[in-house]
């Protein structure tokens, strides 16, 4: 059998009529319209919003707000500004041990980082785990040197 434009038909069940709910019992979806008997879910204006628990304090409000997340892989440093390095004399070596001796650092738990706040007027040999760009420039401008120590 060949099909022509005047003999084309849609597949059975593909063109289903929309159900008209609440238009009498004989229509098939009358009375309760498929919503069951009584209750909030059978009323008009449904559905309730997501997370609604019938007036009970919902779970998302009962659980405390999450605060103070610990940042994984966070790099913590014991920091010292250049202004504190003014206590050192000409061509002295500045490292964690010398900073602890001069009481500029107290029980350092983390690697040492030098920040660029302040001025350096003397030539120093600074040994630290990290330097800011400005700190490195200021130390080298004063004739000193910056040596990066390996992190352990």
Curated annotation (Swiss-Prot):
Cellular compartments per GO CC: cytosolic large ribosomal subunit
Pfam families in the cross-refs: Ribosomal_L27A (PF00828)
Gene Ontology BP term (one): translation
Keyword rRNA-binding assigned: yes
Keywords attached to this entry: Ribonucleoprotein, Ribosomal protein, RNA-binding, rRNA-binding
Keyword Ribonucleoprotein appears in the UniProt entry: yes
UniProt feature, compositional bias: Gly residues: 25-37
Biased composition (Polar residues): 1-12
Domain of life, per lineage: Bacteria
GO molecular function terms attached to this record: rRNA binding; structural constituent of ribosome
Disulphide linkage map: none
Basic residues biased stretches: 14-23
Record PANTHER family: 50S RIBOSOMAL PROTEIN L15, LARGE RIBOSOMAL SUBUNIT PROTEIN UL15M
Function: Binds to the 23S rRNA.
Similarity section: Belongs to the universal ribosomal protein uL15 family.
HAMAP family named among the record's database cross-references: Ribosomal_uL15 (MF_01341)
Name by which UniProt lists this protein: Large ribosomal subunit protein uL15
The species this protein was found in: Prochlorococcus marinus subsp. pastoris (strain CCMP1986 / NIES-2087 / MED4)
